[in-house]
């Protein structure tokens, strides 16, 4: 990583929205990646104003999205899927149809599993096997740490101007532990 990229990451303002235990994981990964300006918002607060940040990382869990306005900054939605994790990015100008989904975590898990099955993507079997646990709203600490790591990597790439996959494309990984 160049000094300029390190500066861009340090100067980038990130807002994390979600459950406190998950926020702690994301915050730690963002700090490890070099982010300095991190704003924390409890997931219980429905947000109408984003404020002055450069991107948002919102952990939804089994609920609905807190940000209800059309935003002009990237939004990263990390998900813990018990045996692994995934993330979806909404970039400015993208249609954020995710705003209208109930139980977004389950919807995304089924979407990703269906995509992998349809396109015969190797290495996704763990997600299909995790769907019953996801339907029961089970989580795991390892999956939350993996989701936080994925989120921080995406945030760093956005901060330095690299292209990232955005919805309908996604990121998916087995647990790192």
Regions picked out by a protein language model, each given a short descriptive name:
Residues 1-15, 32-33, 45, 169-170:
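N-terminal charged helix/coil linker that caps or initiates catalytic domains
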Residues 19, 42-43, 80:
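Cofactor-binding loop segments of dinucleotide-utilizing enzymes, especially the Rossmann-like FAD-
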Residues 149-165:
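Oxidoreductase and adenylate-handling cofactor-binding alpha/beta cores
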Residues 25-33:
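Rossmann-fold NAD(P)-dependent oxidoreductase module
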Residues 161-177:
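A short, charged, Gly/Pro-tolerant segment at domain boundaries
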Residues 50-146, 173-176:
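E1/E1-like adenylate-forming module used to activate ubiquitin-like modifiers
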Residues 36-47:
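NAD(P)-binding Rossmann-fold cofactor-contacting core
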Residues 22:
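Hydrophobic/small residue at the entry helix of a nucleotide-binding pocket
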